[in-house]
Regions:
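A generic "alpha-helical surface" signal
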Residues: 15-19, 62, 69, 129
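Conserved aromatic-histidine-acidic binding/catalytic patches
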Residues: 9-12, 59, 126
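A beta-strand edge to alpha-helix "cap/lid" segment located at domain peripheries
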Residues: 93, 100-169
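Short, low-complexity N-terminal intrinsically disordered segments enriched in polar/charged residues
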Residues: 1-42
């Protein structure tokens, strides 16, 4: 299968990548944090830049820039019985689309994939919408892809947020 970038990938690879991204959305919506964390490599990074033109997360202000250890720490905090900010009523729904494989390095089994997302969050009797672009760097490991880097570019990143994001988009 050839896309507009001229990259030739198999339909099986495209489907496998799509299924990974759809699965990620599902486990986030179901608040299955451990399953979500398992989608990342041990050195995986979740990054949400504070600016759309940001080239690096290191040494820059970010909304999120978390390695495996920090993601695990956030899970422990969110799941803690005294985490009142995460009380019942917090729900999300993710939609992922326009999944495109942008590059493939067959020697390192690494893919760069972009997609679009829309996430609706219901929390504190309020409905919030987030949308934007995901860029995933995926590594094939044990016959399955894992996330080495997930970059989340919010469409409205410069806009005001009425309360702090507690969980990942």
């Amino acid at each position: 299968m050839s896309n507009r970038t001229g990259l030739v990938t198999s339909a099986d690879t495209q489907r496998e990548v799509e299924q990974l991204l759809y699965h990620q959305a599902e486990v986030l919506d179901e608040r299955r944090w451990e399953d979500w964390l398992d989608l990342f490599t041990e050195d995986g990074i979740y990054w949400m830049p504070a600016s759309p033109d940001q080239q690096s997360g290191e040494g820059q202000p970010n909304i999120f820039y978390e390695d495996h250890y920090l993601m695990d720490m956030r899970i422990r905090r969110v799941e803690h019985p005294y985490a009142h900010s995460q009380a019942a009523g917090h729900r999300t729904s993710h939609v992922v689309s326009n999944v495109m494989i942008k590059s493939e390095n067959q020697a390192s089994h690494e893919l760069v994939v972009t997609s679009r997302f829309h996430m609706v969050e219901y929390r504190l009797d309020d409905l919030r919408h987030f949308g934007g672009k995901y860029t995933h760097t995926l590594i094939k490991s044990d016959d399955a892809y894992k996330i080495k880097l997930q970059r989340v570019d919010l469409t409205n990143v410069e806009g005001p947020f009425d309360f702090v994001m507690q969980v990942w988009l």
